[in-house]
Amino acid sequence: MTMKYIYKYIVAAAFMLSVSGVSAYGQEYKDLVEKAMDYTRKDSLQQAEQLYQQALKLDPKNARNALLFSNLGTVQRRMGKIDDALQSYTLALNIIPYSTAILLNRATIYMEKGMLDKAYLDYCNVIDLLPEDKEARLFRAYIYMQRRQYKEARIDYNVIIGKDFGNKPARIGLAMLDQKEEKYVSATDRINLLIHDYPEDASLLKMRANLELEQGQDEAALADLEAAVRREPSSGETYELMGDICLRLKKKAEARKYYEEAIQSGVSRASLSDKLKKCR
């Protein structure tokens, strides 16, 4: 989730409070909210959380509380209080159920918690309200892919591409879809274009290597993995895979070198003992 939503409702709440006439009772509510917003801007999140909670207790029926619950949820999310943030966003949506910003915030938490079905519903609601919202389309497409609903995922990615032809995540998503559906020529063409546009992105080279491995192109896959590790440090699993490819190609010295790299990157020597024996 981008940071563009974090202060959106803080600003809105400040505006609503500033233009409203307030009683002495309302003044206390207003002061608590203003102090909470100030603490939020200063990253004093615990104090901000407490002040938002005080304001909500002071006037639990205030129509502006949807914005306060949303702000509170964002503060709690930044504090790592994910369950509390989820509850706060839900309380906000109970008051203003068609807020796309709050729906997106709650959906992100559902995704983090692995609650994909609930995230899916929030993303669908956002898309009903804003059919071209990229974030909702991207994450809904991801959920569709997890469900193996490839046709639906492709529709979402294509909606994004239709408005933003160069959108990198959507282009990657379409390449992955082609690969899953064994449309290898199309998948390769898409990944080649991505690598052309983002030549320093090692993850794209690894994607192409994986595609090449599925087609039995070990030499090409090894070349891409070697190029990837030159661009950025890689995981032990990547080096282990490179060792496995070298063993299949009967390049034992190179295989041993990559297995040793894997061990240095965190893979246990014991788990590679049999493979190392094959390198003799």
Provide a role label for each language-model segment.
Residues R41-K42, V75-R78, E112-K113, Q146-R147, ...:
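Register position in tetratricopeptide repeats
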Residues Y29-K30, A63-L67, T100-A101, K134-E135, ...:
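Helix-start (N-cap) detector for alpha-helical repeat units in TPR-like alpha-solenoids
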Residues Y29, E240-D244, R248-R280:
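Terminal, low-structured helical/coil segments at or just beyond the last alpha-helical repeat
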Residues L58-K61, I95, L129, K163-D164, ...:
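Structural marker of alpha-solenoid helical repeat scaffolds
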Residues L67-N71, N105, F139, G173, ...:
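Canonical tetratricopeptide repeat
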